[in-house]
Swiss-Prot record:
Keywords annotated in UniProt: Flavoprotein, FMN, NAD, NADP, Nucleotide-binding, Oxidoreductase
Organism: Burkholderia lata (strain ATCC 17760 / DSM 23089 / LMG 22485 / NCIMB 9086 / R18194 / 383)
Binding site for NAD(+): Y12
Protein name stated in the entry: NAD(P)H dehydrogenase (quinone)
PROSITE patterns the UniProt entry points to: FLAVODOXIN_LIKE (PS50902)
Annotated EC: 1.6.5.2
Entry binding sites for substrate: W99
HAMAP family (alphabetical): NQOR
Cofactor remark from the record: Binds 1 FMN per monomer.
Family matches, as Pfam families: FMN_red
Length: 200
């Protein structure tokens, strides 16, 4: 049975929502075990609450060592100036031991993201994230244009061939749209299908 981990960091809940729909898509594939976890928050709880960070997320916190237990990992992060969030970077910077062992070589890696604005760095966040995954020897999976949501021109929407994305709005008030969640589910399903093939 293939094992898929959806691992995310979310400040205000947008990436959390996307992660839940990524996991839903992955769970639609028979014979795949899906786990949803998050990376640790690095901001002290009182300070996090003061700036509106959603600290009551249900997903358990992952450990670095457990990454080796999965056949595929789908990473989710908000964008920080065109890069992944510091919390995710801090977590990944602790994976040197896994790298030394080649523990992630040949496993699937995929990324989804959130930005505050329409041109807020979604694609650079995902493609710069890929650098870390490639150093680990992971096999990168994105979202092909077979996913019809990528060519939706009827609304402002996230979604890239590199991975699912959402637009939070400058004040965080915009929630992931139906189209964005469809793309997220597609990505989760695609990764799970490929992981199942690789694990068989």
């Amino acid at each position: 049975m293939a094992k898929v981990l959806v691992l995310y960091y979310s400040s205000y809940g947008h990436v959390e929502t996307m992660a839940q729909h990524i996991a839903e898509g992955a769970k639609s594939v028979a014979g795949v075990e899906v786990t949803l976890k998050r990376v640790p928050e690095t901001i002290p709880v009182d300070q996090a609450r003061a700036i509106g960070v959603k600290v009551d997320q249900a997903a358990p916190v992952a450990t670095v060592d457990e990454l080796a237990d999965y056949d595929a990992i789908i990473f989710g992060t908000p964008t920080r100036f065109g890069n992944m969030a510091g919390q995710m970077r801090t977590f990944l910077d602790q994976t040197g031991g896994l790298w030394m062992k080649g523990a992630l070589v040949g496993k699937i890696g995929s990324v989804f993201a959130s930005t505050g604005t329409q041109h807020g760095g979604q694609e650079t966040t995902i493609t710069s994230f890929h650098t870390t995954l490639l150093h680990h020897g992971m096999v990168i999976v994105g979202v092909p244009y077979a996913c019809s949501g990528l060519v939706n021109m009827n609304e402002i929407t996230g979604g890239t061939p590199y991975g699912a994305t959402t637009l939070a709005g400058a004040d965080g008030s915009r929630q992931p749209s139906a189209n964005e969640l469809d793309i997220a589910r597609y990505q989760g399903k695609r990764v799970a299908e490929l992981a199942s093939k690789l694990a068989s």
